[in-house]
Amino acid sequence: MRPIDDSSLTWDDGALVTVDQRGLPHEARPLRLRTADQIIDAIKTLAIRGAPAIGIAGAFAVVLATRAHTRDGIVDVAAVRAEADRIAAARPTAVNLAWAVDRVRPRIAEGADAVLAETLDMLAEDGRVNRAAATHAADLVQRLCGPRPLRVLTHCNTGRLATSAFGTAIGALRVLAERGAVEEVLVDETRPLLQGARLTTWELAEAGIPHRLTIDSAAAWAMATGLVDCVLVGADRVTARGDVANKIGTYAVALAAHRHGIPFVVVAPESTRDPATASWRDIVVEERAAEEVTAFAGSATAPVGTAAFNPAFDVTPADLVTAVVTEHGVVHGTVAAEPGARIAATARELYARGWMPGTAGNLSVRTGDTAVVTASGLAKGELSATDMVRVAIADSTPLPGQDRRPSAETTIHTAVYRATGAAAVVHVHSPFATALATRAGAADEVRVLRITDYELIKGLGGSDPTAIDLAIFPNWRDVPRIAADIERRLAEHPGAPPVLCIAGHGITTWGENLTQARDRAECLEAVCELVLRTGREHAFAPQTHVLEMGPT
């Protein structure tokens, strides 16, 4: 039996080497896959399965496709891209497959070695990411359930077979077991393909974690009779609002956990989160062959010709999920994420849009008479929940005993908090709003631009849904001076909209929570883009005089 820390996917002499999961637990058949078609077939037939694992396997398939379409050192880029599309479509529900293929696409023109280097980096990252997510999840479970040996129910398979190393939900079980905090794991068999019975029990036995197997339909009764303290599962896709697509049967487990007040915790890498998918209704749920239901171990269990409903996945609504935990900590769930986790997740989203390039920009959340704000000098695309500073709203000073330091722009946040009832502030450098502010602003005075008759104005939080007076502040080198200007104007104009611009600098928005503040930043950027794209020029006046700008 292989050591559990071994990777389930390796690259050897031009081939992807793995174990055929269809043979487990009785036979660990090695697979040596040398073509993209072989990998696609392995993914479709579940020889390779698990969202992170099929993502990495898909990237290796692009490596092999690039090799196959290279002649005399020249890559047929169009042919490889077409192959990449086919690879990404092999299983539609798990977002990791398309994510991994998209990650290596930009390297195709550089040749197979470049695609391979990116894929090997991804493979190395997977173990680190899984271990981090598993540790965060174990910490959360112990916080929710207490420091005692726990009885945990899990569904499907989420170990190194489903990833490449360590595992997600099984990884969390391993961390808990290392802490002496596992009494027993109850494993759903996971019909119809028995990933729990065949794979999870095999991995738990390998790790020496005590467990029992149960039929899927007994999970709710196990909860009702007090045999379960917590549920830990993985995910194939997490929507923008926190809905979770996972192996069929997960939704039923979540419903039972909700009914009995048992924490339902999802453990998955960030690559499983899909901000482009708004809700569960947008997820394509794969349906598989009827024979998986109408037969068992090769023998028919239903009359010939019996029709079957055989979805491979279901989607658990966000309100049934206690927490979605990634390598960055809690990012979704009914359990309130710590401010740092929420801020870090939002910062990564805004970084991906190009609004917080490098170390620029900052976000904050009010916590009583203090605020939690992103620390200075850190790349916003890599923030974690601990990359924050708590400051006093009264004077912007950091509370003692912290390693991180706040940036000078923290004074803008605290100025907004002192002058308004805001609970969160977003300060970013979105391009269209910054460009408009640069054109409209002045070096030494606040200017106001009236924008009218754009539908998105209603998303800016002003009192008039058809018009907004957008204040544009001068960009003083001394940032506290900008903050003083902002606080003074907000005090003088208590009905001012919760958005503003700083010439040549960026935008600041605020709201009742971080989501609302972020949404207002999105709407402001969109409105400013519309204004600029109309191509109309105006002279801009100081704050005592307002000029109008609206659609012609």
UniProtKB/Swiss-Prot annotation:
Cofactor binding: number and manner: Binds 1 zinc ion per subunit.
Species of provenance: Nocardia farcinica (strain IFM 10152)
Family statement drawn from the similarity comment of this UniProt entry: In the N-terminal section; belongs to the eIF-2B alpha/beta/delta subunits family. MtnA subfamily. In the C-terminal section; belongs to the aldolase class II family. MtnB subfamily.
Role played: Bifunctional protein that catalyzes the interconversion of methylthioribose-1-phosphate (MTR-1-P) into methylthioribulose-1-phosphate (MTRu-1-P), and the dehydration of methylthioribulose-1-phosphate (MTRu-1-P) into 2,3-diketo-5-methylthiopentyl-1-phosphate (DK-MTP-1-P).
Binding locations of substrate: R49, G50, A51, R91, Q195, N246, K247
Binding site for Zn(2+): H427, H429
Region described as Methylthioribulose-1-phosphate dehydratase activity: spans on this chain: 334-535
GO cellular component: cytoplasm
EC number: 5.3.1.23, 4.2.1.109
Superkingdom of this protein's organism: Bacteria
Catalyzed reactions per annotation: 5-(methylsulfanyl)-alpha-D-ribose 1-phosphate = 5-(methylsulfanyl)-D-ribulose 1-phosphate; 5-(methylsulfanyl)-D-ribulose 1-phosphate = 5-methylsulfanyl-2,3-dioxopentyl phosphate + H2O
Molecular function in Gene Ontology: methylthioribulose 1-phosphate dehydratase activity; S-methyl-5-thioribose-1-phosphate isomerase activity; zinc ion binding
Active site: D236 (proton donor)
Region annotated Methylthioribose-1-phosphate isomerase activity, chain positions: 1-333
GO BP: any one term: L-methionine salvage from methylthioadenosine
Cofactor: Zn(2+)
Annotated pathway: Amino-acid biosynthesis; L-methionine biosynthesis via salvage pathway; L-methionine from S-methyl-5-thio-alpha-D-ribose 1-phosphate: step 1/6; Amino-acid biosynthesis; L-methionine biosynthesis via salvage pathway; L-methionine from S-methyl-5-thio-alpha-D-ribose 1-phosphate: step 2/6
Site entry: Transition state stabilizer: C156
Any single Pfam family the record assigns to this protein: Aldolase_II
UniProt entry keywords in alphabetical sequence: Amino-acid biosynthesis, Isomerase, Lyase, Metal-binding, Methionine biosynthesis, Multifunctional enzyme, Zinc
Signal peptide (UniProt feature, chain positions): none
Record protein name field: Probable bifunctional methylthioribose-1-phosphate isomerase/methylthioribulose-1-phosphate dehydratase
Metal-binding recorded as keyword: yes
